[in-house]
From Swiss-Prot:
Lineage of source species: Bacteria, Pseudomonadati, Pseudomonadota, Betaproteobacteria, Burkholderiales
Family label: Belongs to the ATPase alpha/beta chains family.
Gene that encodes the chain: atpA1
InterPro entries in the cross-refs: ATP_synth_asu-like_sf, ATP_synth_asu_C, ATP_synth_asu_C_sf, ATP_synth_F1_a_nt-bd_dom, ATP_synth_F1_asu, ATPase_a/bsu_AS, ATPase_F1/V1/A1_a/bsu_N, ATPase_F1/V1/A1_a/bsu_N_sf
Site (Required for activity): S378
Species, as recorded: Polaromonas naphthalenivorans (strain CJ2)
Protein name: ATP synthase subunit alpha 1
Job description of the protein: Produces ATP from ADP in the presence of a proton gradient across the membrane. The alpha chain is a regulatory subunit.
List of residues binding ATP: G174, D175, R176, Q177, T178, G179, K180, T181
PANTHER family: ATP SYNTHASE SUBUNIT ALPHA, MITOCHONDRIAL
Keywords, ordered alphabetically: ATP synthesis, ATP-binding, Cell inner membrane, Cell membrane, CF(1), Hydrogen ion transport, Ion transport, Membrane, Nucleotide-binding, Translocase, Transport
First-tier enzyme category under EC: translocase
Main location: membrane
Superkingdom of the source species: Bacteria
Topology of this chain in the membrane: Peripheral membrane protein
């Protein structure tokens, strides 16, 4: 048999050319230790800060992910997002090459999700078309637009004294059980029909409390435009820490497309505690109150993402699909104080980051003044420019009346005989205080709130018994709705009052007062 070298070379050549060799390069490491939801990994060379790491799946096949937070010389410290009991020393960990992402878009509206955007309400999967990273840089100064549109909460005391604008960060601060969540939920309920999408982030709360909030939103018909992100007290510290950023990314979807969104963080004190726990377990050096050194940055980078962005930003982001529209993300962070101490570390941090605060007091709450807002130290630094003309013109004297009333009431306890002017001021203050009371889940429209403020401003309530003030108010609302619907519609549409409307409203309130017994 004759061997032909040329033939053999040709055969080898064709075999080499037809070889389909593929190599899969993976960056992987080994678990060195696992404890308290913290995993130390050796051998991950090209891992990014905040990168998602893939761990062995659970027994039922659910993928397990972690977040790379500590990048050290010879190891990586990672927090596990979810269950970690099945992870053992020696397990293989793979880099994903991706920063943590959550699903975004209108598909999430009406759903309850966890910190990773996975549904937990038993209503089936969420088929979101888009996803985005949870950590994003806030819009720059040039991309922003000044806050000049109101975000009505429907609460008389807030909309008149501490108005909130679209794109503002307004802190709600107070001790436990002072009605902080109630104020935020009322603000969400009042956005019905106003084209504002809402995100409610529950951090470290009892599952029963979250369930009650969802039920309240459903009963008010507010779940249709709301996403609830729940990281309950039973979940890991890592999930509680991440949840606020996940919710913010979901809210930014609407802001970046020329829409308005409202996000409530309930509450950031628990997020700071969760972050402190994660940091201490990662052996980062503790600082004041055992919080890590970057706890200010934890909240500032989150709250700076709430902003009003200009038309150019929206146009550039949507590549020209949306033109001539501004977008906004309004944040209502909640902070819980201990015994009214607003000078503690986390409260002072968040007060300095936000554009104002609504301070709720236990003493006022227990006295039946609800919402229990302390008008003296509650401020809105930018909301005044966004207040509607109608409310702005009518609410000018309310804060002054209340401040003077509180001061005089303290002196009046010791004085036996008071002059006429002082007595008048005390009577007026008592009526204004009574008038600012409002039951939960009953937000007011701009026109009805305007009518109430008009009645108290023009002295129509000066001779009404203090105990009957709220009855007078509800009776007036019903009277105006029934007999002066065109006037109320005009006030609602214009958000301002001309001389004709003022004359008509004066006549209407006078007529109602005669019929009020």
């Amino acid at each position: 048999m004759q061997l032909n070298p040329a033939e053999i070379s040709e055969l080898i050549k064709s075999r080499i050319e037809g070889l389909a060799a593929s190599s899969d390069i993976r960056n992987q490491g080994t678990v060195v230790s696992v404890a308290d939801g913290i995993v130390r990994i050796h051998g991950l060379s090209d891992v990014m800060q905040g990168e998602m790491l893939e761990f062995p799946a659970t027994a039922d096949g659910t993928p397990t992910y972690g977040l790379a937070l500590n990048l050290e010389r010879d190891s990586v410290g990672s927090v596990i997002l979810g269950e970690y009991e099945h992870i053992a020393e020696g397990d293989t960990v793979k880099c994903t090459g991706r920063i943590l992402e959550v699903p975004i878009g209108p598909e999430l509206l009406g759903r309850v999700v966890n910190a990773l955007g996975q549904p937990i309400d038993g209503k089936g999967p969420i088929n979101a078309k888009l996803s985005d990273v949870i950590e994003k840089v806030a819009p720059g100064v040039i991309a922003r637009k000044s806050v000049d549109q109101p975000l009505q909460t429907g609460l008389k005391s807030i909309d008149s004294m501490v108005p909130i604008g679209r794109g503002q960060r307004e802190l709600i601060i107070g001790d436990r059980q002072t009605g902080k969540t109630a104020v935020a939920i009322d603000a969400i309920i009042n956005q019905k029909g106003k084209g504002v999408s809402c995100v409610y982030v529950a951090i470290g709360q009892k599952a029963s409390s979250i369930k009650n909030v969802v039920r309240s939103l459903e009963q008010a018909g507010a779940m249709d435009y709301t996403i609830v992100v729940a990281a309950s007290a039973s979940e890991s510290a890592a999930m509680q820490y991440v949840s606020a950023y996940s919710g913010c990314t979901m809210g930014e979807y609407f802001r970046d497309r020329g829409e308005d969104a409202l996000i409530v963080y309930d509450d950031l004190s628990k997020q700071a505690v969760a972050y402190r726990q994660v940091s201490l377990l990662l052996r980062r050096p503790p600082g004041r109150e055992a919080y890590p050194g970057d706890v200010f940055y934890l909240h500032s980078r989150l709250l700076e993402r709430a902003a009003r962005v200009n038309e150019k930003y929206v146009e550039d982001f949507t590549k020209g699909a949306v033109k001539g529209k501004t977008g906004s993300l309004t944040a209502l962070p909640i902070i819980e104080t201990q015994a009214g101490d607003v000078s503690a570390f986390v409260p002072t941090n968040v007060i300095s980051i936000t554009d104002g605060q609504i301070f709720l007091e236990t003493s006022l709450f227990n006295a039946g003044i609800r919402p229990a807002i302390n008008a003296g130290i509650s401020v809105s630094r930018v909301g005044g420019a966004a207040q509607t003309k109608l409310i702005k013109n009518l609410s000018g004297g309310i804060r002054t009346d209340l401040a003077q009333y509180r001061e005089l009431a303290a002196f009046a306890q010791f004085a036996s005989d008071l002059d006429e002017a002082t007595r008048k001021q005390l009577d007026r203050g008592a009526r204004v205080t009574e008038l600012l009371k409002q039951s939960q889940y009953s937000p007011l429209s701009v026109s009805t709130m305007g009518a109430t403020l008009f009645a108290v401003n023009k002295g129509f309530m000066d001779d009404v018994d203090v105990k009957k003030v709220l009855a007078f108010e509800s009776g007036l609302h019903a009277w105006l709705k029934d007999k002066h619907a065109p006037l109320m519609a005009k006030l609602e549409a214009n958000k301002a009052m001309d001389k004709d409307a003022e004359a008509e409203l004066t006549t209407a309130v006078t007529a109602f007062k005669k019929s009020f017994a």
